[in-house]
Curated annotation (Swiss-Prot):
HAMAP family reported in the protein's UniProt record: Trp_synth_alpha
Alphabetical list of InterPro entries matching this protein: Aldolase_TIM (IPR013785), RibuloseP-bd_barrel (IPR011060), Trp_synthase_alpha_AS (IPR018204), Trp_synthase_suA (IPR002028)
Enzyme active site: E50 (proton acceptor), D61 (proton acceptor)
Annotated keywords: Amino-acid biosynthesis, Aromatic amino acid biosynthesis, Lyase, Tryptophan biosynthesis
Protein task: The alpha subunit is responsible for the aldol cleavage of indoleglycerol phosphate to indole and glyceraldehyde 3-phosphate.
Gene Ontology molecular function, alphabetical: tryptophan synthase activity
Top-rank taxon, per record: Bacteria
Subunit structure: Tetramer of two alpha and two beta chains.
Protein name: Tryptophan synthase alpha chain
Pathway named in the protein's UniProt entry: Amino-acid biosynthesis; L-tryptophan biosynthesis; L-tryptophan from chorismate: step 5/5
Pfam assignment, any one: Trp_syntA
Similarity section: Belongs to the TrpA family.
Length: 278
C-alpha cells in the first residue's frame, strides 16, 4: 500500500530536497476561512499538511495552538466538520498529503471504525495521535493501518534506545521528531542536536524523519530541514493567522494571505536547505 505521504516523500527524495510540513487548526477562525487557507497552502509551498482536530483539553499544545482550538470550537467545528473540510479540499487537490493531528478522545467518541471509514473516504492519509502510546496500538494504530492510513508517531529527545523500537514498530508515513521537550511553540531548536537525534532515529528506520516544535522563521526552517527529511511549522502559522484577525477574533481580508505569505517564506528557507545539506 502506497499512500500520498509515501508518494510525496518519494518525489522529494528524487528532487533531493526536504519537505515543508505545515500545521493548521481545522475551523480556525471559522470553517470557510479554514478551507480557503488549506487550499492556498500547497501553492505557497506546503508539501504535507497537518490539520489539527480541535479538542477541549489539548495538554501537549502551547498557548497559540490551544487558542486556535478554542476559536475553532467556538466556530462550531466538530470532528465530522473537520472530515468535511478534508472532503472539500480533496475536490480540488488529490495530491497533497493530509494528516489529522490531535487527541484520541474525539475519535473514541465518534467511534473508531466509523471514524476510520469516514476519514479514508474523505481523503485523509495519516494520523498523529499525541496521547496514544505504542502499548495501546490495538485501540487505533492497528485498525488505522488496516484501513490504509499511515500512523505517524512522535519521538522526543527523551525517547531512548530501549524505547525507540517500540515507538517505531507500527509507525508508517514518517517519524515526527519533537526537537524540544515541553509544549508546542516554545523555545527554538538546536540544529546540531537535532541532526544527531535524526541520525539516531534513522539507525532504526528507513522512514523519513520530520522535525517540529520551535521552528518559527525561514532561517530556522532551513537549518532544521538541512538535518532531516522535513521541517514542521505550526505555532508560527497560527500566530500569523491570529495577528490578522479583527478585534472580535474574526477573519479579515488579510487572514488567508497572512498565512500563505509566511508559508511561502518558510518554503523558500526549506528549499534552500538542499544546498546546505550537500
Amino acid at each position: 500500500m502506497t499512500t500520498r505521504i509515501d508518494t510525496r516523500f518519494g518525489e522529494l527524495k528524487q528532487q533531493g530536497r526536504p519537505a515543508l510540513v505545515t500545521f493548521v487548526m481545522a475551523g480556525d477562525p471559522d470553517l470557510d476561512t479554514s478551507l480557503q487557507i488549506l487550499k492556498v497552502l500547497p501553492a505557497a509551498g506546503a508539501d504535507v499538511i497537518e490539520i489539527g482536530m480541535p479538542f477541549t483539553d489539548p495538554m501537549a499544545d502551547g498557548p497559540a495552538i490551544q487558542a486556535a482550538g478554542l476559536r475553532a470550537l467556538k466556530a462550531g467545528t466538530t470532528l465530522k466538520k473537520t472530515l468535511g473540510l478534508v472532503r472539500d479540499f480533496r475536490a480540488t487537490d488529490n495530491a497533497t498529503p493530509l494528516v489529522l493531528m490531535g487527541y484520541y478522545n474525539p475519535i473514541y467518541i465518534y467511534g473508531v471504525d466509523a471514524f476510520l471509514a469516514d476519514a479514508k473516504a474523505a481523503g485523509v492519509d495519516g494520523l498523529i495521535i499525541v496521547d496514544l502510546p505504542p502499548e495501546e496500538d490495538e485501540e487505533l494504530c492497528l485498525p488505522a493501518m488496516k484501513a490504509g492510513l499511515n500512523f505517524i508517531r512522535l519521538a522526543t529527545p527523551t525517547t531512548d534506545e530501549k524505547r525507540l523500537p517500540a515507538v517505531l514498530a507500527n509507525t508508517s508515513g514518517f517519524v515526527y521528531y519533537v526537537s524540544i521537550t515541553g509544549i508546542t511553540g516554545s523555545a527554538s531548536a538546536d540544529a546540531s542536536a537535532v541532526g544527531a537525534a535524526v541520525q539516531r532515529i534513522k539507525r532504526h528506520t528507513n522512514l523519513p524523519v520530520c522535525v517540529g516544535f520551535g521552528i518559527r522563521t525561514p532561517d530556522a526552517a532551513q537549518a532544521i530541514a538541512a538535518q532531516a527529511n522535513g521541517a514542521v511549522v505550526g505555532s508560527a502559522l497560527i500566530d500569523a493567522l491570529k495577528a490578522s484577525l479583527n478585534a472580535e477574533g474574526r477573519a479579515t481580508k488579510a487572514t488567508v494571505g497572512a498565512v500563505a505569505d509566511l508559508v511561502a517564506s518558510l518554503a523558500a528557507g526549506v528549499r534552500g536547505a538542499k544546498q546546505a545539506a550537500e
